């Protein structure tokens, strides 16, 4: 049975039970298995009536919603290749990806976005608004088309080191394996039970990991609640009351910071107990416990931790974290509160996942062992190589880049890492220049650096930083001796604002630091070809970079 057949089967089993939810205006709106099948069928009728057929490609440009999920399933059920796009992406970038993938039709939520696409791409294919897709009369649901393992299911765009997004081609075989493996891990985490597991979800479905969670949740006995307003995430969590929550490091770090600030503001006994309990927990993890640690932990567990857990989510049993490595102290923080944090690791090219924590053997700071059926090894330079049925088939219309990434059956991830004696992997850095923010967004620095340099003729070099951080920042070097006097904060800020105006939110530069002297070969910060030695630069200016982020976050 394919992943799609499993989903349709589970929806039939959950005919009268809620399977998907949206949160709007402090109310939870649910659809049952039967209701979701019905709107999927409406969408399928729309597709067939427009002459769309197996192998065609369609772009799906909308924020998360029940209708997004239904259209995605309808497209796949008809054998149509889905090209999901990020709704908050700059219109010019969206058009570039659609020109590359040549969709037969574009599905869009917003008429204003549709108009912008037509303005930038007058020859664009027909654009259909989601509202019109579901205007038809309901009819009896029919089974999905059967997919062979080699059938293309989706093309998901991911940033490359050149800055030009590449379409990652994923097949039915890729998704079949990952959904099965993810279900296996979730079975260990959630265990057998008669009631549906409640899962909360906010990351855009155009991200591979987010999409895989959607498919996995629909293929099992669960209720997936979708966030619709990030500004109200805390309130939505209380309404959904989930047991499990997929998130990224940035969010967990914000929650941690908010809790610590709240404790500090309370004063009194709380400010005495909490930091000491936290230090005691870290020492216990490191097997360095001191006399009195048990007392501080007991006080924390009896007087503080239960209330904090309830404020995060009264029913929360575990957090699942991916998209970027999670700081070990943040993972330990939530474990101290009694909320396990499981990590997963993967890329779009690995169909989102290649490692996942075993709930019974979580090691903080590690992302778990390879999932069943997937092989991983460490190359001589420390790069992580992956092989298995989850590996993408190709980069869309990029044979040279495909050949470079896939060598002798092994996918070269561009990440550095190492396994421990238990087979759990630790991610240690990036081989490539690609910056991965804590939000999980992948950003090629070169195009943004080039644009900033164009607006800063006084600068010698511009270097973007932000790997495993919450936002981008820049190091800007002055042009020539005593150049610090020629390059002002106002000039840099003006250039940043100009460039930011054409960038999506996650590609915007939020802070900068002026370096008085240019980087040179002699200083060890440029190669003999004049290229930036990024690792050396970030190491040399580690203190300045840390101060930059601390100042911006305070």
Predicted region positions:
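Gly/Ser/Thr-rich phosphate-binding loop
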Residues: 243-246, 258-362, 457-460
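Conserved ATP-binding/catalytic segment of the ANL
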Residues: 370-437
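Conserved pre-ATP/AMP-binding loop-to-beta segment of ANL
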Residues: 16-18, 139-157, 164, 190-198
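Conserved AMP-binding A3 loop
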Residues: 30-34, 153-180
């Amino acid at each position: 049975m394919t992943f799609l057949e499993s989903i349709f089967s589970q929806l039939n089993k959950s005919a009268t039970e809620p399977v998907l939810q949206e949160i709007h205006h402090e109310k939870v709106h649910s659809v049952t298995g039967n209701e979701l099948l019905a709107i999927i069928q409406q969408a399928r009728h729309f597709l067939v009536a427009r002459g769309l057929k197996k192998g065609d490609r369609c772009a799906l440009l909308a924020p998360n919603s029940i209708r997004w999920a239904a259209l995605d399933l309808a497209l796949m059920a008809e054998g149509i290749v889905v090209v999901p796009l990020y709704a908050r992406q700059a219109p010019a970038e969206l058009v570039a990806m659609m020109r590359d993938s040549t969709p037969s039709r574009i599905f869009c939520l917003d008429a204003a976005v549709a108009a912008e696409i037509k303005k930038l791409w007058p020859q664009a294919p027909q654009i259909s608004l989601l509202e019109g897709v579901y205007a038809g009369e309901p009819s009896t649901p029919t089974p999905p088309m059967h997919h062979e393992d080699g059938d293309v299911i989706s093309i998901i765009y991911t940033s490359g080191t050149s800055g030009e997004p590449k379409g990652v081609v994923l097949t039915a075989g890729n998704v079949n394996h990952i959904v099965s493996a993810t279900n296996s891990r979730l079975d260990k985490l959630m265990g057998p039970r008669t009631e549906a597991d409640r899962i909360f979800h906010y990351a855009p479905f155009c991200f591979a990991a987010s999409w895989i969670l959607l498919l996995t949740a629909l293929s099992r006995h669960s209720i997936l609640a979708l966030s619709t307003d990030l500004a109200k995430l805390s309130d939505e969590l209380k309404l959904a009351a989930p047991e499990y929550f997929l998130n990224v490091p940035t969010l967990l770090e914000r929650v941690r910071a908010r809790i610590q600030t709240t404790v500090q503001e309370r004063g009194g006994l709380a400010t005495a107990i909490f930091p000491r309990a936290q230090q005691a927990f870290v020492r216990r993890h490191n097997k360095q416990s001191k006399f009195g640690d048990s007392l501080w932990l007991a006080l924390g567990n009896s007087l503080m931790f239960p209330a904090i857990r309830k404020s995060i989510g009264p029913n929360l049993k575990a957090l699942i974290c991916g998209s970027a490595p999670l700081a070990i102290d943040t993972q330990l923080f939530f474990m101290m509160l009694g909320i396990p944090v499981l990590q997963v690791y993967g890329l779009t090219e690995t169909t989102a996942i290649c490692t996942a924590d075993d709930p019974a053997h979580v090691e903080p700071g590690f992302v778990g062992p390879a999932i069943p059926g997937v092989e991983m090894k460490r190359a001589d330079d420390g790069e992580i190589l992956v092989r298995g049925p989850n590996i993408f088939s190709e980069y869309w219309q990029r044979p040279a880049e495909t050949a470079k990434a896939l060598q002798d059956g092994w996918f070269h991830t561009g990440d550095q890492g190492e396994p421990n004696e238990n087979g759990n992997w630790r991610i240690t850095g990036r081989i490539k220049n690609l910056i991965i923010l804590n939000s999980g967004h992948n950003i090629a620095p070169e195009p943004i650096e080039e644009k900033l340099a164009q607006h800063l003729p006084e600068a010698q070099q511009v270097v973007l930083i932000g790997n495993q951080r919450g936002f981008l920042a820049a190091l800007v070097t002055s042009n020539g001796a005593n150049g610090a006097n020629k390059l002002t904060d106002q000039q840099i800020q003006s250039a940043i604002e100009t460039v930011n105006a054409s960038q999506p939110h996650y590609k915007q530069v939020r802070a900068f630091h002026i370096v008085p002297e240019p980087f040179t070969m002699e200083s060890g910060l440029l190669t003999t070809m004049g290229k930036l030695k990024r690792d050396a630069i970030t190491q040399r200016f580690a203190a300045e970079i840390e101060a930059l982020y601390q100042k911006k976050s305070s």
